[in-house]
């Protein structure tokens, strides 16, 4: 008995959706590896920012835009432009993951491999960064990639991280990569 056409179409769409999700996940893991950051934290950042929607655009009260799956703020566009990345390129999930890994690496270099660095991906204001880090930790706990426990920052914690170190310049590593992710 032949399989009904609507069922075949549904199966094909589900297969393509799964393949796209796996490819996108590989972009995240590859970018994290290249920049030496935690891939699970990077993926959780993308989930927090846009649920990994590549074409996401956020409008901020200060007039800036957050672009792509990792919501890269438009204040970074002049520096990214020096490396050939424009606003529209950030709608490519792999480019967005690469830029996010670079930005997160800058925070790790500044604050150390800490929750303060994860929070600083979002904001340099300690209270906002602490809340963001707690949300990233909650995502990792939900995904069972981190044991359940109290949030990294208590609600009343007011101490700031150590003074910042100078972040490294963008390496432009994406330029030598094809935008077709490799299978793991």
Region roles according to the model:
Residues 23-156:
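Catalytic glycan-binding domains that act on GlcNAc-containing polysaccharides
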């Amino acid at each position: 008995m032949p399989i009904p056409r609507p069922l075949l179409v549904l199966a094909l769409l589900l297969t393509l959706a799964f393949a796209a999700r796996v490819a996108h996940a590989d972009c995240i893991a590859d970018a994290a590896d290249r920049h030496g950051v935690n891939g699970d934290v990077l993926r959780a950042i993308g989930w927090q920012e846009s649920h990994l929607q590549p074409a996401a655009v956020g409008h901020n009260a200060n007039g800036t835009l957050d672009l792509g799956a990792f919501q890269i703020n438009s204040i970074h566009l002049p520096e990214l432009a020096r490396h050939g990345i424009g606003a529209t390129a950030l709608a490519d999930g792999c480019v967005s993951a690469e830029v996010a890994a670079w930005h997160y690496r800058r925070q790790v270099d500044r604050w150390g491999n800490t929750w303060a660095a994860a929070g600083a991906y979002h904001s340099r204001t300690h209270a906002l960064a602490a809340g963001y880090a707690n949300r990233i930790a909650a995502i990792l706990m939900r995904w069972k990639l981190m044991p359940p426990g109290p949030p990294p920052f208590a609600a009343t914690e007011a101490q700031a991280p150590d003074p910042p170190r100078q972040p490294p310049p963008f390496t432009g590593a994406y330029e030598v990569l094809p935008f077709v992710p490799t299978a793991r």
